[in-house]
Protein backbone atom coordinates (compact mmCIF):
# COMPACT_ATOMS: atom_id res chain seq x y z
CA UNK A 1 0.00 0.00 0.00
CA UNK A 2 1.42 3.35 -1.01
CA UNK A 3 1.15 6.41 1.16
CA UNK A 4 0.93 9.84 -0.37
CA UNK A 5 1.42 12.98 1.70
CA UNK A 6 -0.06 16.36 0.98
CA UNK A 7 2.99 18.47 1.87
CA UNK A 8 5.66 19.44 -0.60
CA UNK A 9 8.82 17.33 -0.49
CA UNK A 10 11.13 19.91 -2.02
CA UNK A 11 12.48 21.30 1.26
CA UNK A 12 16.00 20.36 2.36
CA UNK A 13 15.13 19.68 6.01
CA UNK A 14 13.97 16.30 7.27
CA UNK A 15 12.77 15.63 10.80
CA UNK A 16 13.92 12.08 11.41
CA UNK A 17 11.96 9.79 13.74
CA UNK A 18 14.20 7.11 15.24
CA UNK A 19 13.17 4.45 17.76
CA UNK A 20 14.99 4.88 21.07
CA UNK A 21 17.13 1.74 20.67
CA UNK A 22 18.20 2.77 17.16
CA UNK A 23 18.95 6.30 18.36
CA UNK A 24 21.39 4.78 20.83
CA UNK A 25 23.16 3.13 17.86
CA UNK A 26 23.37 6.56 16.21
CA UNK A 27 24.80 8.10 19.39
CA UNK A 28 27.44 5.35 19.61
CA UNK A 29 28.33 5.78 15.93
CA UNK A 30 28.61 9.56 16.23
CA UNK A 31 30.79 9.21 19.34
CA UNK A 32 33.12 6.82 17.49
CA UNK A 33 33.38 9.04 14.41
CA UNK A 34 33.52 12.38 16.24
CA UNK A 35 30.65 13.77 14.15
CA UNK A 36 27.36 15.21 15.38
CA UNK A 37 24.31 12.94 15.37
CA UNK A 38 22.71 14.94 12.58
CA UNK A 39 25.83 14.89 10.39
CA UNK A 40 26.30 11.16 11.04
CA UNK A 41 22.70 10.51 9.97
CA UNK A 42 23.11 12.60 6.79
CA UNK A 43 26.30 10.76 5.82
CA UNK A 44 24.65 7.40 6.42
CA UNK A 45 21.54 8.41 4.47
CA UNK A 46 23.67 9.62 1.56
CA UNK A 47 25.67 6.39 1.51
CA UNK A 48 22.52 4.25 1.70
CA UNK A 49 20.89 6.15 -1.18
CA UNK A 50 23.97 5.48 -3.33
CA UNK A 51 24.38 1.82 -2.29
CA UNK A 52 20.71 0.86 -2.47
CA UNK A 53 18.84 3.15 -4.88
CA UNK A 54 15.94 0.67 -5.02
CA UNK A 55 15.66 -0.20 -1.35
CA UNK A 56 13.13 -2.91 -0.47
CA UNK A 57 11.99 -2.37 3.09
CA UNK A 58 10.77 -5.28 5.14
CA UNK A 59 8.08 -3.15 6.76
CA UNK A 60 8.02 -1.14 9.93
CA UNK A 61 9.36 -3.58 12.51
CA UNK A 62 9.30 -0.97 15.28
CA UNK A 63 5.58 -0.29 15.31
CA UNK A 64 4.63 2.30 17.90
CA UNK A 65 7.82 2.23 19.97
CA UNK A 66 9.12 5.36 21.66
CA UNK A 67 10.86 7.66 19.21
CA UNK A 68 13.43 10.43 19.34
CA UNK A 69 13.49 13.22 16.79
CA UNK A 70 16.51 14.49 14.89
CA UNK A 71 16.50 17.31 12.34
CA UNK A 72 18.73 16.84 9.31
CA UNK A 73 19.71 19.44 6.70
CA UNK A 74 20.36 17.80 3.33
CA UNK A 75 22.51 19.01 0.46
CA UNK A 76 20.91 19.35 -2.99
CA UNK A 77 22.13 16.00 -4.35
CA UNK A 78 21.03 13.99 -1.31
CA UNK A 79 17.68 15.78 -1.24
CA UNK A 80 17.03 14.92 -4.91
CA UNK A 81 18.04 11.28 -4.36
CA UNK A 82 15.73 11.08 -1.34
CA UNK A 83 12.84 12.65 -3.27
CA UNK A 84 13.34 10.14 -6.11
CA UNK A 85 13.46 7.26 -3.61
CA UNK A 86 10.32 8.40 -1.80
CA UNK A 87 8.51 8.82 -5.14
CA UNK A 88 9.42 5.23 -6.06
CA UNK A 89 8.32 3.82 -2.71
CA UNK A 90 5.27 6.00 -2.11
CA UNK A 91 6.40 6.78 1.45
CA UNK A 92 6.99 10.28 2.80
CA UNK A 93 10.53 11.69 3.00
CA UNK A 94 10.61 11.32 6.78
CA UNK A 95 9.77 7.61 6.71
CA UNK A 96 12.04 6.93 3.72
CA UNK A 97 14.98 8.66 5.41
CA UNK A 98 14.33 6.98 8.78
CA UNK A 99 14.13 3.49 7.27
CA UNK A 100 17.33 4.03 5.32
CA UNK A 101 19.28 5.44 8.29
CA UNK A 102 18.04 2.59 10.52
CA UNK A 103 19.03 -0.01 7.90
CA UNK A 104 22.47 1.59 7.49
CA UNK A 105 23.09 1.72 11.25
CA UNK A 106 22.26 -1.98 11.53
CA UNK A 107 24.21 -3.14 8.45
CA UNK A 108 27.25 -0.88 8.93
CA UNK A 109 27.68 -0.11 12.65
CA UNK A 110 31.31 1.02 12.20
CA UNK A 111 31.01 3.18 9.11
CA UNK A 112 33.70 5.70 8.23
CA UNK A 113 33.56 7.01 4.69
CA UNK A 114 36.25 9.50 3.79
CA UNK A 115 35.33 9.45 0.09
CA UNK A 116 32.34 11.73 0.70
CA UNK A 117 34.48 14.60 1.91
CA UNK A 118 36.65 16.75 -0.31
CA UNK A 119 39.44 19.02 0.71
CA UNK A 120 39.09 22.77 0.42
CA UNK A 121 41.32 23.54 -2.53
CA UNK A 122 40.20 27.10 -3.29
CA UNK A 123 40.22 30.20 -1.13
CA UNK A 124 36.40 30.47 -1.21
CA UNK A 125 36.10 26.87 0.06
CA UNK A 126 37.82 27.71 3.34
CA UNK A 127 35.28 28.11 6.13
CA UNK A 128 37.40 29.79 8.77
CA UNK A 129 39.62 32.79 8.18
CA UNK A 130 43.18 32.51 9.36
CA UNK A 131 44.21 34.90 12.10
Swiss-Prot record:
Keywords linked to the UniProt accession: Activator, Conjugation, Cytoplasm, DNA-binding, Plasmid, Transcription, Transcription regulation
Cell compartments where the protein resides: Cytoplasm
Highest taxon of source: Bacteria
Cysteine disulfide partners in this protein: none
Chief location bin: cytoplasm
GO CC field: cytoplasm
Pfam families: TraY (PF05509)
GO MF assignments: DNA binding
Family classification: Belongs to the TraY family.
Protein purpose: Conjugative DNA transfer (CDT) is the unidirectional transfer of ssDNA plasmid from a donor to a recipient cell. It is the central mechanism by which antibiotic resistance and virulence factors are propagated in bacterial populations. Part of the relaxosome, which facilitates a site- and strand-specific cut in the origin of transfer by TraI, at the nic site. Relaxosome formation requires binding of IHF and TraY to the oriT region, which then facilitates binding of TraI. Upon binding to the oriT region TraY bends DNA 50 to 55 degrees. Also positively regulates tra gene expression.
Record note on quaternary structure: Part of the relaxosome, a complex composed of plasmid encoded TraI, TraM, TraY and host-encoded IHF bound to the F plasmid origin of transfer (oriT). Interacts with TraM, probably through its C-terminus.
Name of the protein in its database record: Relaxosome protein TraY
Amino acid sequence: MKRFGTRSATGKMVKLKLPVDVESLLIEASNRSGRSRSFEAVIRLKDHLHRYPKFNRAGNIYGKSLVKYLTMRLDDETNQLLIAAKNRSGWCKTDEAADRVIDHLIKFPDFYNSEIFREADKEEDITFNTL
